[in-house]
Amino acid sequence: MTRPVLFGLGDLAERLEGLVGAEPGTDGAPSPVDTAMAYVHVGQLFASAEPRVVTTILGSCVSVCLWDPQAGVGGLNHFLLPQAVENGISSARFGNVAIRHLLDEIAGLGGQAARLKAKVFGGASVIDAFQSPQNTLGMQNVALARSVLNDAGIPVVAEDVGGAQGRKLVFQTRDGSAWVRKI
């Protein structure tokens, strides 16, 4: 059994293994039954070759979900800022770093870049209410995600970005499905 990769949580990664979710509700969310769950905070990422339900809450932050349908490997990140301005910074709080780290982790679990599918979520204007909708921090994060994925040749097959509301994201590594609720 391969061990899921969870960055930034220390021993919490071990405590998350083996958790079983509750019965699915009537709101259309993916069923977490018999699947371990993980929550990804800002500046973290998660990748697994095992079935996992991964959740996060997004405002102006962005999550890129990647999935290799043939290998059954998937994961997501949660980044705060588009890119590091200083050389040598490798924090997953920055989109350019977080996406590269996620690509590396998925490759390490058997995923291949040529087969990856991407989904992009977040980028709301929850703080930038008085800026132009195209120039908010959230939309800068979205633009960076699209650019890095495009440069890597990874198609974005779904997205829910922008707007003025945050989002709760639920992603399943087993089949690449995602569920989003505006909050």
Predicted feature residues:
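Active-site microenvironment for binding and transforming phosphate-containing groups
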Residues: 1-183
